[in-house]
Regions:
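Hydrophobic alpha-helical bundle segments that form small-molecule/ligand-binding pockets
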Residues: 128-183, 226-230
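Helix-turn-helix
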Residues: 24, 28-66, 70
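Amphipathic alpha-helical segments used for helix-helix packing
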Residues: 70-72, 101-121, 131, 162-169, ...
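Amphipathic C-terminal alpha-helical segment
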Residues: 155-170, 188-209, 224-232
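Short, basic, alpha-helical segments at the C-terminal edge of helix-turn-helix-like DNA-binding modules
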Residues: 74-78
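N-terminal intrinsically disordered/low-complexity leader segments
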Residues: 1-20, 195-205, 234-238
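Hydrophobic alpha-helical connector segments
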Residues: 81-127, 143-146, 150-153
């Protein structure tokens, strides 16, 4: 159905001996960015993490900009769509969206990275965009409209992951029940005559949120607009 090209997920690329690969450098940089923020990713810090001299990294990335581009390229390398499968454009587009969401869930630094570099200088981003435009023109949109839709989908994925329900990022797991309790009490204490729906929302904080249900629902929501416009004839809105 959908080609997912394996990358070094979950920081699985290891540096052994003299074999310092481009993928290993990008993967370790991603680990730093995900755990400490993009500002923590410097050539000097990365070299220390990898146990090499800064000069060793210049073999793969000449400067910090190239390193950031390499990180984006590495993260998006699995975003592909195969037109030869014979599946509908709707299913193939959903696979693209779900894959992008999955990458962003695994690498929370990706949205910041995407806004920090010229994405069109990376092979994987251009390939993913080209594949998506092909799907959207197949759906009936013009190339220009397809680009608008693709931008909407990318920003929608960023918003979905950034707004996922639950406790604040980085909160220790043993503190999560208390955080949810306090949030529930806060909402329950709002004036019911003025904010009845907010008070009702409080009940949703009794248990851990169902993340898989949340992401499936949001993917449906995101794609429903595209499918609806395609069915109505996207190009008629020019």
């Amino acid at each position: 159905m959908y080609l997912v090209h394996e990358t070094c997920t979950l920081y699985g690329c290891q540096v052994t001996g003299d074999r310092l690969t481009k993928a290993a450098v990008a993967e370790r940089a991603l680990r730093l960015a995900d755990e400490e923020g993009l500002e923590a990713v410097t050539v000097r810090r990365l070299a220390k993490e990898l146990g090499v001299t800064p000069m060793a990294l210049y073999w793969h990335f000449k400067n910090k900009d190239e390193l950031f581009l390499g990180m984006v390229d590495h993260m998006l390398s699995g975003v592909r769509s195969d037109p030869r499968t014979g599946e509908s454009w709707q299913k193939r587009l959903r696979a693209v969206v779900e894959t992008v969401i999955g990458v962003m869930r695994a690498h929370p630094s990706l949205p910041t990275l995407l806004h920090s570099v010229d994405k069109t200088r990376t092979e994987s981003f251009n390939r993913a965009t080209n594949d998506t435009l092909a799907l959207l023109t197949e759906a009936g949109f013009t190339v220009e409209e397809g680009f608008w839709v693709a931008s909407y989908l990318l920003n929608g994925c960023i918003g979905i992951v950034g707004a996922q329900p639950g406790c604040p990022p980085g909160l220790p797991s043993d503190q999560e029940p208390e955080w949810r309790r306090q949030k529930r009490v806060q909402l329950e204490g709002m004036p019911a005559d003025r904010f009845p729906m907010m008070v009702e929302l409080a009940a949703s904080y009794r248990d851990e949120p169902d993340m898989e249900r949340y992401y499936a629902f949001c993917a449906d929501l995101l794609l429903a607009a595209v499918e609806s416009m395609a069915a109505a004839g996207g190009s008629q809105h020019r």
